[in-house]
């Protein structure tokens, strides 16, 4: 049985470390990936979601510049500083005004902190948000959302925009205002100032992007500051103006990331003035505050510019070399990001000179920024977050509890404890008495006794073991390795410290020379307390049969040894005080010819005494006593009774359970070794390579240690279904109680869902979903963290309570994964398969709408680049539909079917089958709207709900309609599409045929009957190109037409036979019904109506006129060869819609009991 190694495996604890440190600080932060386009957000905590009002699903994959929080009062200069901070490796603090989802404005201090990986490269950014104050929305009549409505509606015209700013914000704003004036404090010549191209255009909020080459400076009217004289008085006397700046060249668009097609960057060049006086005077807001207070500049954690290393030296620099170096660096153009979507524009390559300047800027990301992270985020000196697999952090002079040294030391202490358990009772009973009776020993001190020296060494080793235990790591309840010395000491004090301390006291040294040898012998027996730790140490071998038997035999022998020492002590204590020689020692001396003399001396040797005593205890414990050594005195008899009682218990507990122990031990180990043998045989047979073989073996060992080889499903199957549901409800209670989509569900629905959930345990590094895998399940994370990668780029980090998969209600068939899902730590996930979830929701339709509306998938794994008409997609969908056959449809009887089936557009069915959200959309003829992100379900280019893979225009099978009326009798929208709620365009054409088949009980007619599943309302429709070419080959179309022809021939044959049967039944009833009839009715009471043929009553409703639709439908086989095929891809269609026969017969058909719609 392998030792559990779960707590020592390397884990990526980056996210857990950040969350654990921020729990008690009420932090609000997001984590962005620096290697993807726009530095997309890959994680946001609950505090940030509460701050901005957005959910985690809405924030994921957005640019970390938080442009979705921008509004009319958001300073473009502050947004430019955040964007510039994303280029470098230095931490930066920016004060900016943001807007919540409900439209309320707040002033926020943003900390942009880079995070490096094991190679030292910055791959992530942590943005911490701290609310400075809530801004007063002066003149704002209503709180609109920050992404809707024109910006001019926020403030009344003619009123000043005033902010109540704190002093740090005012100073920072003054610095930004001063930097816009030539030669002012903090001008562009300062190396620490943020230099961007500015103009005086008003700040207009952008919906998707922030163009930093159009950043404007805030004027006095927007900032709400006093006159310029008050600002100068606040800062102090500034340096004289240095003249007007040089004209700025027109900015050119460049790209810093050739791989990211979704974004581009622009470079803005600014020539700074060579004004050293302004640089020495002040270069940042911190220096201004220091000048104002008359104190030296405070120590700073952050840099407000890109030239932070030069700042401290330039304030006091007097040499020409320093000034020349500053002038050279100040000529480097500043770099700003431009998050503008330029997907349609070609890639613009930057000149060679610009590349040489950009390269050092990008290389700054490889600086060591870990200390900055800990200082800014207050993580503590012992926590350095790095996104990598981290081994447990161990303090200096700390010993790992699983290290080889600790293992060897434990075995050494174990041997010393066994020595103590054997020799301490023997020394106390035999040797001390022998020393008293023997001749006087020479005066050579303590070293003349060999056992005393060994005892002294044992005492020293026990004391050293106590010191080592104070520096040995342990595993806490969370399976974390604790290496902090203080926590280790507290844990040891609460555990084994008292027992170890008592066992390590050197009583021989403390009472040496006092003459009380008997007292020393009794006190030394306290070392036997260490046997408790030995039992715990040997408990890990309790599943090995041979080890258990050996330990039991050793325990039996040790108890016999202790009892032998006590048996000798009793006889030796009574021997000098007995007048009659009846003790067992006197009998032993007489038997071996070594009797005791009158003075009590002489007698058998120590060897004879010990062997005889051990012989007696063994024979008494095993109840085999021969009687040659027998108790004679009362004390000996009482002790013998006690030995017999102990022997009976020992004999019953040990030897009586030997067979049971062997069976139990070999049952567990046999299962483990059998399964391991199968795994190794599988590896050998298939020639698995070594890396994959190691992963297989490690996963098997970890899974065995986690479940102990118990199949939970097999255990549950042994209980009744009601008890299984209760157990599953208990196992999934945390998910069902705290996950929002499951709130409001009935007890029966929760029990049904709990039965379908499966728990998955994944170790670090295990890949749960590979790119391109079929998404057949929905995953809910209950513990641990995972990462989602596209190639080698991390696109998302998900933690507890996150959901990933695909929105099952939007697609009729499962899609493919667009990335790899890999575990960072030990994870527990709940997953439910697609078919199981849809089956439960069909059984509870009243809960289905609430579930789909409240379900927020944190990351959508569906690949949006799939081509709907690609080869093999039809076979995939057909196989999926055949696999998922739901024969029962739990639909409310109050739900009415649409009156007419509708018509499929010739340009594609996406216009009519997009659901209610696709009607009345003013965005264009297709109702399109810009997508919010690459992972949103609206931006999918795959087939949507209700969409078929090939365009089709179906010839109607009903009576002609007026010219201006569309098929189905429903009005058209502005762009000509029909506003129909139905999702089945062919249901009307085949409704008559399906009702006939359901009446005659054709089981094959119910095989593919499913309710049309309409999608939930979505913000935007899928964009379908007008010229969508048919991707199916001509042979496939002809094959499908031939199959339809054969099916119709079979149906025609069956219909003819059924009609003949109907006619025969009608002829038999000619004498029982009136001559003039149009339908068979139940005859009235009379002498001739002896019986009523109930099964025949609905038959005459199927007249030949009502079957004319079948003949029209069979004429479909004569369509020209180039006619388009019938749609095979799309949502499952319900073929039996009784509302479609209204135009064919005045009397409604009687619905058969097996019809799903009944």
UniProtKB/Swiss-Prot annotation:
Keywords: Cell membrane, Coiled coil, Glycoprotein, Ion channel, Ion transport, Membrane, Methylation, Phosphoprotein, Potassium, Potassium channel, Potassium transport, Transmembrane, Transmembrane helix, Transport, Voltage-gated channel
Recorded coiled-coil stretches: 1034-1061
Record flagged with keyword Metal-binding: no
Residue span of region Disordered: 232-314, 869-987, 1116-1158
Stretches assigned to the Extracellular side: 424-449, 516-519, 568-610, 632-637
Domain PAS: 17-88
UniProt-annotated stretches for the region cNMP-binding domain: 741-841
Chain positions with Omega-N-methylarginine modification: 1013
Intramembrane runs of residues: 611-631
Recorded domain comment: The S4-S5 linker acts as a signal integrator where it both couples voltage-sensor domain (VSD) movement to pore opening and closure, as well as providing a binding site for other domains that regulate activation and/or deactivation of the channel.
Protein name listed in UniProt: Voltage-gated inwardly rectifying potassium channel KCNH2
Source species of the chain: Canis lupus familiaris
Species classification: Eukaryota, Metazoa, Chordata, Craniata, Vertebrata
Name of the gene this protein is made from: KCNH2
